[in-house]
Structures are given as structure tokens and as C-alpha cells.
A protein has these predicted regions:
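ATP-binding N-terminal substructure of ATP-dependent carboxylate-amine bond-forming enzymes
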Residues: 1-115, 127-134
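Intrinsic-disorder/low-complexity coil detector
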Residues: 11, 63, 135, 139, ...
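Conserved ATP-binding module of the ATP-grasp superfamily
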Residues: 46, 120, 152-176
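Short acidic/polar capping segments at secondary-structure boundaries
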Residues: 98, 126-131, 146-150, 160-163
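ATP-grasp fold ATP-binding core
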Residues: 113-114, 137-156, 174-176
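Intrinsically disordered, low-complexity boundary segments flanking structured domains
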Residues: 128-132, 141-143, 171
């Protein structure tokens, strides 16, 4: 981790976690910098922290009063960083561990929403290997990784135009 910028406000010390090592690193850096700029205008002591593998050490050294979580995708939104912050006893902005983990898992989220009476689009889970020889549907469909954020790994497939092997080989390794 790297402390990217520290401001000298009078208020609480806020560490803005950004960057990280997910596929959404770049957008997280932009979000984190925007959050930092907004907080600086409000009398906070802002510490910009690019969350790398030494994030535990850096947070332990910096001892912020609170962490503003601007991490995106895996590790930032899946309950991992939330669990780490709870273990370190550092308050943070974001949903808790369980809510984050459930929200990041598309299949479990869909199950919870459906069982709560909320309408959801039709869908089912398929392994990447299930796309090697045939299409699971005859009409156009969307493939999305079960545990990525934003539009990472989203593919629109037209079975009439895209051979199954090409679809499977074009899929990133983030699909199982």
C-alpha cells in the first residue's frame, strides 16, 4: 500500500482506500480521488491509501479514525476488506461483511431477491466448460461472472453468430 496524499485538516483522520488489485483498480483510483477531494473540503484529515498487499501494516501504522472504502470489485465490495477492517477494529463506510459478500454473489442475490418477492430476470448458473460445445439457449443471452462488479466479464452472445468454442475461449479466466 502507498499513502498517496495526506491533508492537514483539523477533524477526524479518514483513510480513503482506493486502487487495490481487482480488475476495477483504475475506476477505484478515480473514485477514491474524488472522495478525497470532497472530504478535504469538509475539514477532515484525509489520507489517500492505495490498498496493496501491505494494507494491514499501513492501516496499523496510520491508525485512521475511519476508513472510506472506495475500493471496487473483488476484495473491495465482497466482504473481504470489510472483514479485515472489523478485525482491525477500524470503523468504515460500506455495508458489513455478510451484506457485501451476499451482494457480490449474483446467484445468491438473485435467490434472496426472488424469495423476497422482487422481480428478477430469468437466469441460471453455468460453468465456462458448459459453453465449450453448445449454447445453453437458442436466443441471444448475456454471460456475467458470478462474483465480479460493474460490467467486468459481461458478454452478449448471439447463438446464431457466435460459435460455442469461440464464446468459451473469449471468456476471461474470471469465469470458472
Amino acid at each position: 500500500s502507498e499513502a498517496m496524499g495526506i491533508s492537514c485538516g483539523k477533524g477526524p483522520r479518514v483513510a480513503v482506500l482506493m486502487g487495490g488489485h481487482s480488475l476495477e483498480r483504475e475506476v477505484s483510483l478515480v473514485s477514491g480521488q474524488a472522495c478525497s477531494a470532497a472530504l478535504r473540503g469538509k475539514e477532515f484529515q484525509v489520507i489517500e491509501l492505495d490498498a496493496g498487499r501491505d494494507v494491514v501494516q499501513r492501516l496499523s501504522e496510520l491508525r485512521p479514525d475511519v476508513v472510506f472504502n472506495a475500493l471496487h470489485g473483488r476484495w473491495g465490495e465482497d466482504g473481504s476488506i470489510q472483514g479485515l477492517l472489523e478485525w482491525l477494529r477500524i470503523p468504515y463506510t460500506h455495508s458489513g461483511v455478510m451484506a457485501s459478500a451476499l451482494a457480490m454473489d449474483k446467484q445468491r442475490s438473485k435467490h434472496i431477491f426472488s424469495n423476497s418477492g422482487l422481480p428478477t430476470a430469468p437466469g441460471f448458473m453455468i460453468e465456462k466448460s458448459g459453453l465449450l460445445t453448445s449454447h445453453p439457449l437458442d436466443k441471444p443471452y448475456v454471460v456475467k461472472p458470478i462474483n465480479e462488479g460493474s460490467s467486468i466479464g459481461v458478454y452478449f452472445v448471439n447463438p446464431k453468430e457466435d460459435p460455442p468454442l469461440k464464446v468459451a475461449s473469449d471468456m476471461p479466466s474470471i469465469l470458472r
